[in-house]
Design a protein with these regions (language model features):
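Pocket-lining segment of extracytoplasmic ligand-binding domains
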Residues: 1-83
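Serine/threonine-rich low-complexity intrinsically disordered regions
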Residues: 5, 24, 82, 104, ...
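Helix N-cap / beta->alpha transition motif
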Residues: 21-22, 38, 114, 140-146
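Secondary-structure end/capping motifs
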Residues: 45-132
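Conserved C-terminal helix/tail region of periplasmic/extracytoplasmic solute-binding proteins
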Residues: 119-169
Length: 169
């Protein structure tokens, strides 16, 4: 039995290690790809963070548009071909990771702050004695980048991804 992240499980599966995932459901909704930045530093570098998060959102959009393109990019020599040593594991890992990146059903924006997930983390931390109290998510979460992270032309990104796939896929 094993409790851990999707990437840990994928790495074990690639090497033929069969495990039973006992990760608690509440831990599976824990925020993924979290970035912690000092508030002043964040605002001093707002444009840099916006550009990074927009690029990240564009990549997630390509996966939402056509996950096969992300798979092909990942398999390419300048991607992460080692993650595809076992094709079935690579596909399972990609599908699982994609679910963590995509917006909630019915939403079209990427990178939204999942306050409910952070409340779940706080509850789990209280349960194991790591913290004694509830914390106000407004003290450590911000929505300031959600607009700029989604400020891109989705059709243009899709066209560029299709062009890459036609040339390289």
């Amino acid at each position: 039995a094993f409790a851990g992240s999707i990437s840990d499980l994928a790495a074990l599966a690639t090497k033929g290690v069969v495990v039973r995932d006992i990760t608690p459901p509440s831990a599976k909704v824990a925020p993924a790809n979290t970035y912690a930045v000092n508030g002043a530093t964040m605002m001093d570098n707002y444009d840099k963070y916006c550009r990074f998060l927009k690029a990240y959102s564009m990549g997630v959009h390509v996966g939402n548009y056509n996950l096969d393109i992300i798979a092909a990019m990942s398999k390419a020599p300048d991607g992460s071909p080692a993650q595809w040593e076992v094709e079935s594991v690579g596909n399972s890992y990609l599908a699982a990771v994609a679910k963590l990146q995509l917006p909630p059903e019915g939403d079209t924006l990427y990178g939204l702050v999942a306050e409910s997930a952070w409340l779940t983390v706080n509850n789990d931390m209280k349960m194991i004695g790591a913290v004694d109290a509830d914390y106000d998510t407004n003290d450590y979460l911000t929505h300031v980048f959600e607009g700029c992270a989604n400020n891109f032309d989705r059709a243009a990104v899709e066209a560029a991804a299709d062009a890459w796939m036609a040339k390289n896929g």
